[in-house]
């Protein structure tokens, strides 16, 4: 398969994730869309790495996935805290959590 097709797929996934972040109000859905955007960037990194014949992009994508795993833990903890305090997972309610 042509590597350019993978870049088109990465751009499509990033656009879907960006539109989900801008349109949706549910914190869990917004969080999933951010993760989709991150995975689209990883796909582009691996594709560019494969096109140029070195492993740098694949290594960066691997470390990005490790950091994303930690991000999932922190993000879900914040969403659970929001749901427990406001009984809603809406992004609009997150602004009410200020000290």
From Swiss-Prot:
- What EC number(s) has UniProt assigned to this enzyme? 7.1.1.-
Q: In the UniProt record, does the keyword Thylakoid occur?
A: no
What family is it from? Answer: Belongs to the complex I subunit 4L family.
**Descriptive protein name:** NADH-quinone oxidoreductase subunit K 1
Q: What is its main location?
A: membrane
As for membrane topology, the entry says:
Multi-pass membrane protein
Keywords annotated in UniProt? Cell membrane, Membrane, NAD, Quinone, Translocase, Transmembrane, Transmembrane helix, Transport
Its domain of life reads Bacteria
A single cellular component GO annotation: plasma membrane
Q: What class of enzyme is it?
A: translocase
Identify a single GO molecular function assigned to this protein.
quinone binding
- Where, per UniProt, does this protein localize? Cell membrane
General function of this protein: NDH-1 shuttles electrons from NADH, via FMN and iron-sulfur (Fe-S) centers, to quinones in the respiratory chain. The immediate electron acceptor for the enzyme in this species is believed to be a menaquinone. Couples the redox reaction to proton translocation (for every two electrons transferred, four hydrogen ions are translocated across the cytoplasmic membrane), and thus conserves the redox energy in a proton gradient.
Q: How does it assemble?
A: NDH-1 is composed of 14 different subunits. Subunits NuoA, H, J, K, L, M, N constitute the membrane sector of the complex.
Transmembrane segment boundaries: 3-23, 28-48, 59-79
Listed under GO biological process in this entry are: ATP synthesis coupled electron transport
Q: What would be one Pfam family of this protein?
A: Oxidored_q2
The reaction(s) catalysed by this protein are: a quinone + NADH + 5 H(+)(in) = a quinol + NAD(+) + 4 H(+)(out)
Q: Do the record's keywords include NAD?
A: yes
């Amino acid at each position: 398969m042509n590597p350019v097709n993978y870049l088109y797929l990465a751009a499509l996934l990033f656009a879907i994730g960006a539109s989900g972040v801008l349109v949706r109000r549910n914190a869990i859905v917004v969080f999933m869309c951010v993760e989709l955007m991150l995975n689209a960037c990883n796909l582009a990194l691996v594709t560019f790495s494969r096109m140029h014949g070195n492993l740098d992009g694949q290594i960066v994508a691997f470390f990005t996935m490790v950091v994303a795993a930690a991000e999932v833990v922190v993000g879900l903890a914040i969403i659970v805290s929001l749901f427990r305090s406001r009984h809603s997972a809406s992004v609009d309610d997150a602004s009410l959590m200020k000290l």
